Structures are given as structure tokens and as C-alpha cells.
């Protein structure tokens, strides 16, 4: 297990005699080493939740989660000879430095309110806030090794990253059942919104000392922040604001006892604003970008046919629309949204009151402009839109 140790305490239950107040608390800690050099990781996770029955029909839930990670990661992979052949390095080889460090903390607070109007209709309202901070510094090799070399003089790239992101989310929906044309149908109608603010700084620079990947030195001198600013091939501060709003509905219409038609749609609004400075060899260039999508409609349709009490055949279609404003190009601008279509055909089964489930599915997904790493950025810090 490579010195992998994990402990967890998980407790919960009613907190009063009537059971109208319930709670759960979880504490987890894990420390581990790895089979490759240098790397290690320590995780601490805390979770707590309370449920309050305000009335027989209304329940309020409150909770929080916290995660703290302190790691020395091994990033960047292993190079090859210039002709693409294997270097035959030891399985334990890591070419990073001992001062590689990742420190991240995430705190999440959430609340939800559920109300049952009657046997058929209910309301749920939920909100969440989270803050994620990360401080990282790492070095990794870049470039191939000359064929037949017994030593190498491989370029080492260093990177620093200071990250602070705050996210707010809200969702509310009503769902229920209604009778029409001699059948019972289901309907869900809702709306949601989210807001995100990311404030970060990063820089990537070639380190003064190179690496012999055939005999790694894990103690290459660690530069200070001023070195990165003066020698950065790219980097700088980034201040990003993203807002999303949407309304959605889905109806499950019973056309006959074995046949159900599912129709749904979402209307989305999206806006992102990014202010950044791109550094190159100590010189900074201001880059400001904006992205807006208004009233984007994403439909969904499906049909289900009950073959018997256990098996259901189905087919579905949906449009794909995913904003990608969080991805930035090498010049600091944002990517176009990912768009496309998805088709699915299959059979699903359920036995023993849901204790055993099975499915067989065929998918066809067509995507355009999905984000992918830009090969001009060795540390995968920038992206480009892919083709179709």
C-alpha cells in the first residue's frame, strides 16, 4: 500500500426524543506515500449536517464540508528519446523536485428546504457557497533526450500558482403528478443561478539549472517569486467573474400503459468577464475579455416502452451547450461554448425491488469546440477549441 494510512469516524442519528432533529458528522484523515520518488500527500476532510423537521411537511437541512490537502505531487510525466523510443527508466522515477508543493483548502456551506404540499406536489429550494484556495509551486522536465545519450541536459520548467475561487449557487423547483386523458403524468419546473469569482496568479519560467533525466537530481535550487516574474514565458494575474442563470422544465407524459414520452428544455443565460495581465520576460500586457450567451435553448426528448415488469427500452435525444469561459487561450481570451448533440438507445432493467439493476446502452455524441490543451503551453495552462 506504499505507506497509505486512512482513518474515518462517521456518526449520526436523531438528536432529540421525537427525532425531528437529526445530525451526522464525519472526520477523515489520510496520509500516503507513492511508489515513485518525491511524492506524498495528506488529506483532512470534515463533514457535518443537520436536518430540522419544521412541520410534518417541511424539512430544513444545513451543512458544511471542509477539505485540506498538503501534497508533494509528481507532475509532468516522463520524456522519451528524440525518436520516440522508451528511455527504460525505473518504475519509481519521478523527475520533479523535492520542493514541489500543493496546498489546497476547500470550504463548502449548503442549505435546503423541502416542503410537501400534498401527496402529489412538492417544492425544494437549495443554496450552496464554497471557497477554494490553492498555492502551488512545481518543476517538471520539458523536451526529449538525444538518441543513445548516457546523460541529458533537459530543460526544467518551474511554475507558481496562487488561486482563490468563490462559488455561489441556487436552485428551486416544483415537481409533482397530475391526471389527464385517463393517465397520470409527471412535471418538474425550476430555475437556478450561479455566480463564480476567481482571483489567481500564475507564472511559468525556464529554471537556470537543467536536469539529467537518466540520473535525476531532486534538489535543483528553488527560485524565488521575483525570478518567475522577471523570466516568465507566460503568466500573470487573472480576475474572472462568471454568472449563469437558467429555467428548466421536464414532463413525463404517459401515452399508454407501456409507453411514456419525456419532453424537456432549458433556457440559459451566461456572462463572463476576465481581466488579466500576460507577462513575458518581465513585461506585462493587459488582456480583457468578455463572453455572453443569451437565451440559449437546450431541448431534450425521449421515449420509454415497458417490455415487462422488469425491462424498459428507451431512446433519447438532447442538445449540448456548455459555456467554457473558465478556459483561457494562450493570449488570455475565453473559449467558445461546447455545442453538439447526443443520441442514446438502450434497455434497462430492475429486479428485487431495485436491489439489482442492469442496463445496455448505445451512445452517439457529436461535439464541436470542446476545450483541449494547447500544445504551445507545456504545463497545460491554456486551451484551444477542438474540431467536431
PLM feature segments, named:
Residues 1-4, 29-33, 42-44, 66-70, ...:
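Transmembrane beta-strands of outer-membrane beta-barrel pores
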Residues 3-7, 42-44, 103-107, 164-168, ...:
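Residues that define the transmembrane beta-barrel architecture of outer-membrane proteins
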Residues 1-48, 54-58, 107, 352, ...:
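Outer-membrane beta-barrel translocator/receptor signature
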Residues 112-138, 306-309, 313-314, 337-388:
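Membrane-embedded beta-barrel scaffold of Gram-negative outer-membrane proteins
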Residues 109-132, 156-277:
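Face-selective signature of the C-terminal outer-membrane beta-barrel domain
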Residues 11-17, 31, 54-56, 111, ...:
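Outer-membrane beta-barrel proteins
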Residues 51-55, 165, 184-196, 238-367:
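Structural signature of Gram-negative outer-membrane beta-barrels, strongest in the C-terminal barrel
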Residues 30-34, 47-116, 131-165, 209-235, ...:
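Acidic/polar loop-and-plug regions of large Gram-negative outer-membrane beta-barrel proteins
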Amino acid at each position: 500500500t506504499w505507506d497509505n494510512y486512512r482513518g474515518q469516524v462517521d456518526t449520526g442519528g436523531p438528536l432529540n426524543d421525537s427525532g425531528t432533529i437529526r445530525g451526522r458528522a464525519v472526520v477523515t484523515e489520510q496520509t500516503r506515500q507513492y511508489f515513485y520518488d518525491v511524492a506524498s500527500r495528506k488529506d483532512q476532510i470534515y463533514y457535518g449536517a443537520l436536518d430540522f423537521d419544521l412541520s410534518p411537511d417541511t424539512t430544513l437541512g444545513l451543512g458544511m464540508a471542509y477539505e485540506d490537502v498538503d501534497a508533494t505531487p509528481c507532475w509532468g510525466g516522463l520524456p522519451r528519446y528524440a525518436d520516440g523510443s522508451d528511455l527504460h527508466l525505473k518504475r519509481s522515477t519521478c523527475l520533479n523536485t523535492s520542493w514541489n508543493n500543493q496546498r489546497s483548502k476547500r470550504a463548502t456551506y449548503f442549505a435546503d428546504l423541502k416542503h410537501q404540499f400534498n401527496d402529489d406536489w412538492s417544492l425544494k429550494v437549495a443554496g450552496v457557497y464554497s471557497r477554494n484556495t490553492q498555492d502551488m509551486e512545481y518543476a517538471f522536465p520539458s523536451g526529449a533526450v538525444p538518441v543513445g545519450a548516457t546523460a541529458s541536459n533537459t530543460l526544467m520548467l518551474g511554475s507558481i500558482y496562487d488561486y482563490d475561487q468563490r462559488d455561489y449557487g441556487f436552485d428551486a423547483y416544483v415537481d409533482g403528478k397530475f391526471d389527464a386523458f385517463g393517465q397520470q403524468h409527471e412535471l418538474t419546473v425550476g430555475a437556478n443561478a450561479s455566480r463564480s469569482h476567481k482571483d489567481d496568479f500564475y507564472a511559468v519560467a525556464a529554471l537556470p539549472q537543467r536536469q539529467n533525466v537518466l540520473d535525476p537530481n531532486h534538489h535543483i535550487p528553488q527560485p524565488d517569486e521575483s525570478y518567475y516574474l522577471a523570466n516568465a514565458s507566460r503568466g500573470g494575474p487573472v480576475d474572472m467573474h462568471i454568472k449563469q442563470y437558467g429555467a428548466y422544465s421536464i414532463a413525463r407524459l404517459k401515452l399508454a400503459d407501456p409507453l411514456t414520452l419525456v419532453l424537456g428544455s432549458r433556457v440559459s443565460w451566461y456572462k463572463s468577464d476576465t481581466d488579466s495581465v500576460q507577462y513575458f520576460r518581465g513585461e506585462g500586457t493587459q488582456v480583457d475579455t468578455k463572453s455572453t450567451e443569451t437565451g440559449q435553448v437546450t431541448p431534450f426528448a425521449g421515449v420509454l416502452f415497458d417490455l415487462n415488469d422488469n425491462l424498459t427500452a428507451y431512446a433519447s435525444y438532447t442538445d449540448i451547450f456548455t459555456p467554457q469561459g473558465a478556459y483561457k487561450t494562450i493570449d488570455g481570451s475565453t473559449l467558445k461554448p461546447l455545442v453538439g448533440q447526443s443520441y442514446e438507445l438502450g434497455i434497462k432493467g430492475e429486479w428485487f425491488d431495485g436491489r439489482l439493476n442492469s442496463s445496455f446502452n448505445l451512445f452517439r455524441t457529436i461535439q464541436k469546440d470542446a476545450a483541449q490543451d494547447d500544445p504551445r503551453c507545456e504545463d497545460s495552462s491554456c486551451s484551444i477549441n477542438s474540431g467536431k
